[in-house]
Amino acid sequence: MPNILHRDGIAAEPARVFEALTTVEGIRNWWSSETHGDASEGGTFQFRRNRLEVLHAEPSLVKWRYSGPAEDWVGTEIVFRLEWRDGQTFVLFSHEGWREPNEFMHHCSTKWATFLLSLKDLVEKGEGRPDPMDTKIAVGA
């Protein structure tokens, strides 16, 4: 199964990045402003109609599983590995378990890059670019 992979260096300690990944307020400020629910380990959070279960929320690993309704994402896992080195936190990101590398996967790969840069801006500068203020890569998307 193909995966989406990205790497992002953030000039902040891992605890600050972890907080942005494991609180609804954090996720709301870098990914989707419509996020609600429980983003702690064992919780479930939503944005619009999309649902994600938090499988792991440890200081060096955050893992979510998507449960619907976007068919291409159902059962996929979104993983953030946090590594502190050289005075920065490296986020090793993967969106795992795609059934096939279709056009939507290409779109999502680019969108994940924009949202990881939004995460970086949130942690470093105090303001991210969550949906709907995110960088658009196609008309309306």
Predicted ranges, named:
Residues 17-21, 27, 45, 54, ...:
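Hydrophobic pocket/interface hotspot
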Residues 36, 45-99:
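Hydrophobic-ligand binding "helix-grip"
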Residues 97-141:
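A conserved amphipathic terminal alpha-helix motif
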Residues 1-36, 141:
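Hydrophobic ligand-binding cavity/cleft-lining segments
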Residues 29, 73-76, 101-107:
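A short, polar/proline- and glycine-enriched secondary-structure boundary/capping micro-motif
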